[in-house]
């Protein structure tokens, strides 16, 4: 017979590192070319004018300007689109 109680196992005890997703530049904010606007998984926000999309779906500014958000109708859903308006 065991003279000390064996330790049990658990299925918990793991936690992934946060990925710091979300909006990095809000509407009306001035940005420079190359600035990250949104980090996302999938295209929950679509790229608009003067906005590029990276391979991990990150949206970034292609030119200097002011960030603008708009809602567009795409199929049966309303989607958000982010653009960078040029400053004159």
Swiss-Prot record:
Is the keyword Glycoprotein in the record? Answer: no
Which superkingdom does the taxonomy of this entry point to?
A: Bacteria
Per its record, what are the GO molecular function terms? structural constituent of ribosome
Which Pfam families has this protein been placed in? Ribosomal_L27
Q: Which GO terms describe its cellular component?
A: cytosolic large ribosomal subunit
Give the UniProt keywords, A-Z: Ribonucleoprotein, Ribosomal protein
NCBIfam families noted in UniProt: L27
**Family per UniProt?**
Belongs to the bacterial ribosomal protein bL27 family.
Query: Record's HAMAP family?
Result: Ribosomal_bL27 (MF_00539)
Q: What is this protein called?
A: Large ribosomal subunit protein bL27
Organism from which the protein derives: Prochlorococcus marinus (strain MIT 9211)
């Amino acid at each position: 017979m065991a003279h000390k109680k064996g330790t049990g196992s658990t299925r918990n005890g793991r936690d992934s590192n946060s990925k710091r997703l979300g909006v990095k530049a809000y509407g009306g904010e001035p940005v420079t070319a190359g600035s990250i606007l949104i980090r996302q998984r999938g295209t929950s926000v679509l790229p608009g004018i003067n906005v590029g999309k990276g391979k991990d779906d990150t949206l970034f500014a292609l030119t200097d300007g002011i960030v603008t958000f708009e809602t567009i109708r795409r199929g049966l859903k309303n989607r958000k689109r982010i653009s960078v308006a040029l400053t004159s």
